[in-house]
């Protein structure tokens, strides 16, 4: 008897998460053209992320950062045999649908681009293509997983070449999971209520302005979901995290990884893989940096290998001191 995965309760979710797990232990590299994509594939990247500018250039250019030109994305798809991902703006359903129609293998609903919606992220369960999303905390990660994200990545601080924020976000998530494992069901439900409250912000603001009563569990607050349904869904995810001792989806490091040692550090902190944005193609020797970072991820627990692949690479990308960035300059604050 042939099984139709679409008819199973978690059929498409299994497919999406399965694709994401296939990238585990690998490096996903940002590329802006077919030539860079070929360099990434040659170096051993498990996938490439197609975008119009690397994060460092997006940060420098300012203005509104949008989805890349579909023609450019198609050229990258045609140039490589590895999976091709692409970024859409937070909450921009139309960009995501366009990318899905284009045939990308995964969509990154990314804070690196200018957000399109300040209230909601995309309901990713309504798409066939899997999504990856950034997170600074367990709350952000769980909300994205509830929405259907098949992969989580640290936000870090993209385009800085400074790994400190990625380290912070990984440690915050790991510590929250540690705390969760000590909680009983009642306390976990309280955490779920707190995490779910972000979905009620639009309805709460409108009701307050109109002088109406506050939002209740039975009120629809996001798409067709009531606040109570969201709380219950997040509660189930938290129980799963408590049982597993980790997120139920793969969790990659991203945002500021610039050297082989940076990549190895994030793997040592528990990352399942690494995204490298500006670190490769803003370095003095992109092909060699790409190969070295792949080697460092594969051998993150072998310091002698990390040291060897780091020799003679030339200058890493110029970095920024994230502590000198204003709140408006911090890309990680985008999203909810």
Curated annotation (Swiss-Prot):
D-ribose 5-phosphate binds at residues 30, 159, 256, 277-278. GO terms for molecular function: pyridoxal 5'-phosphate synthase (glutamine hydrolysing) activity. It is an enzyme of class 4 (lyase). Gene3D superfamilies: Aldolase class I. The keyword Thylakoid does not apply. It holds the Pfam family SOR_SNZ. Pathway: Cofactor biosynthesis; pyridoxal 5'-phosphate biosynthesis. PROSITE patterns: PDXS_SNZ_1, PDXS_SNZ_2. One of its GO terms (biological process) is pyridoxine biosynthetic process. D-glyceraldehyde 3-phosphate binds at residue 171. SUPFAM superfamilies: Ribulose-phoshate binding barrel. Its EC number is 4.3.3.6. It catalyses: aldehydo-D-ribose 5-phosphate + D-glyceraldehyde 3-phosphate + L-glutamine = pyridoxal 5'-phosphate + L-glutamate + phosphate + 3 H2O + H(+). InterPro entries: Aldolase_TIM (IPR013785), PdxS/SNZ (IPR001852), PdxS/SNZ_N (IPR033755), RibuloseP-bd_barrel (IPR011060), Thiazole_synthase_ThiG (IPR033983). Keywords: Lyase, Pyridoxal phosphate, Schiff base. The active site is at 87 (schiff-base intermediate with d-ribose 5-phosphate). PANTHER family: PYRIDOXAL 5'-PHOSPHATE SYNTHASE SUBUNIT SNZ1-RELATED. Catalyzes the formation of pyridoxal 5'-phosphate from ribose 5-phosphate (RBP), glyceraldehyde 3-phosphate (G3P) and ammonia. The ammonia is provided by the PdxT subunit. Can also use ribulose 5-phosphate and dihydroxyacetone phosphate as substrates, resulting from enzyme-catalyzed isomerization of RBP and G3P, respectively. Belongs to the PdxS/SNZ family. In the presence of PdxT, forms a dodecamer of heterodimers. This is Pyridoxal 5'-phosphate synthase subunit PdxS. It comes from Archaeoglobus fulgidus (strain ATCC 49558 / DSM 4304 / JCM 9628 / NBRC 100126 / VC-16).
């Amino acid at each position: 008897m042939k099984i139709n995965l679409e008819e199973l309760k978690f059929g498409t979710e299994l497919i999406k998460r399965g694709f994401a797990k296939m990238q585990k232990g690998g490096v996903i590299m940002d590329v802006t053209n077919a030539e860079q994509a070929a360099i990434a594939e040659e170096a051993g990247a498990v996938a490439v992320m197609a975008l119009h500018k690397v994060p460092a250039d997006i940060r420098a250019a300012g203005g509104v950062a949008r989805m890349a030109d579909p023609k450019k994305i198609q050229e990258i798809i045609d140039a490589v045999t590895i999976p091709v991902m692409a970024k859409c703006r937070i909450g921009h359903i139309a960009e995501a649908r366009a990318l899905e129609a284009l045939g990308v293998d995964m969509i990154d609903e990314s804070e690196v681009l200018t957000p399109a919606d300040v209230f909601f992220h995309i309901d990713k369960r309504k798409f066939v293509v899997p999504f990856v999303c950034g997170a600074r905390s367990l709350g952000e990660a769980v909300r994205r997983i509830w929405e259907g994200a098949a992969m989580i990545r640290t936000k870090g601080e993209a385009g800085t070449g400074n790994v400190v924020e990625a380290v912070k976000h990984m440690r915050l998530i790991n510590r929250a999971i540690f705390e969760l494992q000590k909680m009983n069901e009642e306390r976990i439900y309280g955490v779920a209520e707190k995490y779910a409250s972000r979905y009620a912000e639009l309805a709460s603001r409108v009701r307050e302005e109109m002088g109406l009563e506050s939002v209740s569990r039975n009120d629809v607050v996001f798409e067709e979901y009531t606040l109570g349904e969201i709380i219950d869904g997040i509660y189930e995810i938290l129980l799963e995290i408590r049982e597993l001792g980790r997120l139920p989806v793969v969790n990659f490091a991203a945002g500021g990884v610039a050297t082989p040692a940076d990549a190895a550090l994030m793997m040592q902190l528990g990352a399942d893989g690494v995204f490298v944005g500006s670190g490769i193609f803003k370095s003095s020797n992109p092909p060699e940096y790409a190969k070295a970072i792949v080697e460092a991820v594969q051998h993150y627990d072998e310091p002698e290998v990390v040291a060897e692949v780091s020799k003679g690479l030339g200058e890493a990308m110029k970095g920024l001191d994230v502590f000198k960035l204003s709140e408006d300059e911090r890309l990680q604050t985008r999203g909810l």
